[in-house]
């Protein structure tokens, strides 16, 4: 691989790594701070908190994989790959199921439907979410009992162990790809069904608005479109994440470092970008982020809040106070 391409790809991976930790870390700290102050969290906040934690773990696993394969002095040891395999699968498992729980939450909370089963599930929303997450634990024994890698030390790029190293790396990505294919069918299908039902609910709602000659800017329409934006981004980014693992597996089979790094770059998009979209789609998180940014701006320009005469208030001060009052 060309040094320039490798350097650019490495820079991009580090940017995604930092961005993903910041966006997910912000969700964790914001909800944790609310819990400390209010001593309680809503169902949606609990889902976002656990989802962000699982994605932070997933981001670190992908980054660890990158440094293990392409680090200048890293050793890939069988036991290390086993630990990386288990933690990667677990973080992917919980990240997918928590995102699915978020999709179902949006569906039951926002959609308008007169079906009896829907009304029953909507009335027992919290129990449905908890029951689904507990049911997801049934799949863990199947994940944890998969055949592990042999314990054999080797150095990436070495002359004597390069073939065995690349074989085990290919086996590693093959195991992850196999598990994600098998165990993600149900949650991904549930999220897709929730997405389709929410589209159907939005269509019915817009049709009702047209018949009543009302505009499309009502709160229900905005809630539908916001939830759909979050759900379609999740489905799209998770599909990209799945394809990134397929790329990595193909790259290990054909010894293509460039394709493997492209797979890592696209894989980091899923846990990083979707969390940023969640922040934009959540009014509380959005207001908190705006308040923090305005507060930092006022801190950086603290000497300019008042003019030299001490009478005129600058726009920085007004912006800071306005955001504080909104939050």
UniProtKB/Swiss-Prot annotation:
Residues exposed to the Cytoplasmic side: 29-46, 109-124, 201-229, 282-327
Keyword Transmembrane helix belongs to the record: yes
UniProt signal peptide: none
Note: Several bitter taste receptors are expressed in a single taste receptor cell.
Keyword Glycoprotein: yes
Compartments where found: Membrane
An example Gene Ontology molecular-function term: bitter taste receptor activity
Gene3D superfamilies, sorted: Rhodopsin 7-helix transmembrane proteins
Function: Putative taste receptor which may play a role in the perception of bitterness.
Source lineage: Eukaryota, Metazoa, Chordata, Craniata, Vertebrata
Family note: Belongs to the G-protein coupled receptor T2R family.
Classification via Pfam families: TAS2R
Native source organism of the sequence: Rattus norvegicus
InterPro entries named in the record: TAS2R
Keywords: G-protein coupled receptor, Glycoprotein, Membrane, Receptor, Sensory transduction, Taste, Transducer, Transmembrane, Transmembrane helix
GO BP annotation list: detection of chemical stimulus involved in sensory perception of bitter taste
Extracellular-side positions: 1-7, 68-87, 146-179, 251-260
Name of the protein in its database record: Taste receptor type 2 member 102
Coarse class of the protein's main subcellular location: membrane
Glycosylation sites: 159, 179
Transmembrane segments: 8-28, 47-67, 88-108, 125-145, 180-200, 230-250, 261-281
Membrane topology note: Multi-pass membrane protein
Gene Ontology CC annotations of this record: membrane
């Amino acid at each position: 691989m060309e040094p320039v391409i490798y350097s650019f790809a490495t820079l991009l991976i580090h940017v995604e790594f930092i961005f993903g930790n910041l966006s997910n870390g912000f969700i964790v700290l914001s909800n944790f701070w609310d819990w400390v102050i209010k001593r309680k969290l809503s169902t949606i906040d609990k889902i976002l908190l656990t989802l962000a934690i699982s994605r932070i773990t997933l981001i670190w696993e992908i980054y660890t994989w990158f440094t293990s394969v392409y680090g200048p002095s890293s050793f890939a040891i069988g036991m290390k790959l086993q630990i990386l395999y288990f933690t990667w699968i677990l973080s992917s498992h919980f990240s997918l199921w928590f995102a699915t729980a978020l999709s179902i939450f949006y569906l039951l909370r926002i959609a308008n439907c007169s079906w009896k089963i829907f009304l029953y599930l909507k009335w027992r929303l919290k129990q449905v979410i908890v029951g689904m997450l507990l049911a997801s634990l049934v799949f863990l024994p199947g994940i944890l009992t998969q055949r592990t890698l042999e314990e054999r030390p080797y150095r990436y790029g070495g002359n004597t162990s390069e073939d065995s190293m690349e074989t085990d790396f290919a086996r590693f990505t093959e195991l992850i790809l196999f598990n994600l294919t098998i165990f993600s069918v149900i949650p991904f299908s549930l999220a897709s069904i929730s997405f389709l039902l929410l589209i159907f609910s939005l269509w019915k709602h817009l049709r009702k608005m047209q018949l009543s000659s009302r505009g499309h800017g009502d709160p229900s329409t905005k809630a539908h479109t916001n939830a759909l934006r979050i759900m379609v981004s999740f489905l799209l980014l998770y599909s990209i994440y799945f394809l990134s693992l397929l790329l990595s597996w193909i790259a290990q089979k054909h010894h293509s470092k460039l394709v493997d790094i492209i797979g890592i770059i696209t894989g980091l998009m899923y846990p990083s970008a979707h969390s940023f979209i969640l922040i934009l789609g959540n009014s509380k998180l959005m207001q908190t982020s705006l308040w923090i940014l305005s507060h930092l701006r006022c801190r950086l320009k603290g000497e300019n809040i008042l003019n030299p005469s001490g009478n005129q208030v600058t726009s920085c001060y007004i912006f800071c106070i306005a955001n504080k009052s909104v939050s």
